[in-house]
C-alpha cells in the first residue's frame, strides 16, 4: 500500500484523492493473504528471506499470540536453504509443522530431515508429510491466541509429487478445514 501511495503521490495526486482508494487495495492472492474471520495467513514464502519476513510480520501483527508455521521445501531444488529455513522457523515461530511442498522426484522425508537439521531440539515440531492433512490438522487445532502461517505455495493450485502434477490449493484446503 505504501508503494502504491508513493507512486501516485509522485504523480501529483493529493492525500484526499489517494487515501480513500488505499482501503480498497489487497495483496495479490497468496501473498500474506488472511483467510476471512481467522488468524490464518497464506503466503508464497519459499525462500529463507521470505519466510523470515512473513513470520516477523505475524509476530508484529500478533504480539500476544503464539505463532505456528506450516511449510516444506521443494524437491530437486536448492538443498542449502532447507536447514536455514528450519533455523528461521525455530527462532521465530512457537510451533512448526513440516510437510510436503513440491517434492518432485525427491523423497519427502529426506527433504523434511534436511529442514529438521536446522531446528532446535526444544522446538515444538510436528511432521505431517501429506500437505492436505497437515493444513487440516493445523487449522482444526489452532488455539484462540494462535496465528497460523501456511507458507510455500501461496497462490499455486497444483502440487508436483514424483512425475504427477496434482490439483492442490493451500487456500482451498484451509478454507474447507475452517468450515
Regions found by a protein language model. Give the residues of each.
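ATP-dependent carboxylate-amine ligase
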Residues: 3-179
